[in-house]
A protein has these predicted regions:
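N-proximal low-complexity "stem/linker" segments adjacent to membrane-targeting elements
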Residues: 1-29, 35
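Glycine-rich, basic loop-to-helix element that forms the pyrophosphate-binding segment
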Residues: 71-87
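Short, flexible, basic/aromatic active-site loop/helix in glycosyltransferases
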Residues: 140-163
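Short aromatic/hydrophobic "clamp" motif used to bind/position activated sugar donors
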Residues: 92
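Conserved donor NDP-sugar-binding/catalytic core segment of glycosyltransferases
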Residues: 104-137
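A conserved acidic beta->alpha catalytic loop
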Residues: 26, 44-53
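Acidic donor-binding loop at a coil-to-helix junction in glycosyltransferase catalytic cores
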Residues: 165, 189-203
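Non-catalytic, C-terminal membrane-associated alpha-helical segments of glycosyltransferases
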Residues: 238-242, 256-358
Length: 358
């Protein structure tokens, strides 16, 4: 019996062939360890570029180490679920196609999972951009462009952790995934031009609710390439609104342990109200970064309200369908999302192509 842990590295991709090649090579050229048997699965999620040719060429360079999987249903969660079902390794690693892992990435994984009680790990994202980050970009919203740093020391994930297990740099034991179930397919970048997210946040809370043990490792580093199209105020506004919608949807299953007002956490109302007052009174005397931070906080709460109250899960609820044992709610939701895709303006569909795999 092979004593090595089998690591499946899953990479969903959508029309990012040049980045995809760098991503795959970074995994297979990382410092090897005799304790891991590594296999990469690339999931082409509605690709219309030459991503498949890139993967086939890489398969010749790394024989037996790369699998190409097709998932025609658009959506990162769908792609991940298909790959999780198609693979069988002890560990499931997940990265995005616009990332490169650091050379020690595999070694950190092997060291961490010598602990048989550890169920999942994550690490920081180092942003890489061809242009300087704009002065107006708020520190509070760096995660919008994929910059994540939760400190220089290992620490356990849990209710007191200042963040979540981000889906672009995560390794989870398969037995833990089998326990908590697949990624929520109504969350995350998907099939129509809305910047849904939070599929990783939903998974994180389910892991914690199942009492799975996780740890953040500052040495589990990935480098994340930032597309210049994301460095605009308009993108940040859209991202914050749709992140709010996603959190409002997720709130049905994972309510926060705080007081609520009109279905929204009361502290969000307070934060948005204070931001509105500052915007109305002090706009001309404040730094642009502070002004934009307050504006984004208002987009946050507006999206949360829409997700919680307007995108009513009474109409199409995968959460409800799990309760009653049927899939009618999920099917209705998919029908509604497909209808919205048909109505989406062409320019928003282009933005969806930019966002889908990231």
């Amino acid at each position: 019996m092979d004593p090595r842990l089998r690591l499946d590295v899953l990479i969903p991709t959508h029309n990012r062939a040049p980045m995809l090649e760098r991503c795959v090579r970074s995994v297979l050229s990382a410092t090897p360890t005799p304790r891991l048997l590594v296999h990469v699965t690339v999931i082409c999620n509605g690709c219309t570029d030459d991503s498949r040719d890139v993967v086939r060429w890489l398969q010749m360079s790394y024989p037996g180490m790369i699998t190409l999987l097709e998932e025609r249903r658009r959506g990162k969660s769908k792609a991940l679920n298909a790959a999780i079902e198609a693979t069988g390794g002890d560990l499931v690693g997940m990265i995005d196609d616009d990332e490169e892992v650091a050379p020690e990435w595999l070694t950190v994984i092997a060291d961490a999972f010598t602990d048989p009680h550890l169920d999942f790990i994550g690490g920081p994202y180092v942003p890489i951009c061809d242009t300087p980050l704009p002065d107006w970009l708020p520190d509070e919203y760096l995660a919008v462009v994929g910059a994540v740093d939760n400190g220089s020391a290992p620490r356990p994930y849990g209710r007191d952790f200042p963040g979540i297990l981000k889906g672009g740099n995560a390794v989870i034991r398969r037995r833990a995934l089998q326990l908590v179930g697949p990624y929520a397919e109504h969350l995350g970048p998907g099939s129509f031009s809305r910047l849904f997210s939070c599929e990783d946040e939903d998974m994180y809370w389910r892991l914690l609710e199942a009492r799975r043990v996780g740890r953040y490792y500052p040495t589990l580093v990935i480098n994340h390439y930032i597309e210049t199209s994301r460095l605009s105020r308009e993108y940040f506004r859209r991202w914050c609104f749709w992140r709010g919608v996603s959190r409002g949807l997720m709130d049905r299953r994972h309510p926060l342990p705080v007081p609520y007002l009109a279905g929204i956490p009361r502290f969000l109302w307070g934060r948005a109200g204070r931001a509105l007052l500052r915007l109305s009174r002090l706009r001309s005397r404040r730094p642009a970064r502070d002004v934009f931070t307050d504006e984004l906080r208002m987009w946050d709460v507006a999206g949360y309200f829409c997700g919680r109250q307007v995108y009513t899960l009474a109409r199409f609820s995968p959460v409800a369908s799990r309760r009653d044992g049927s899939d009618h709610g999920y099917a209705a939701m998919q029908h509604e999302l497909a209808r919205m895709e048909e109505l989406a303006p062409a320019e928003e569909r282009h933005m969806d192509d930019v966002e889908l795999a990231g």
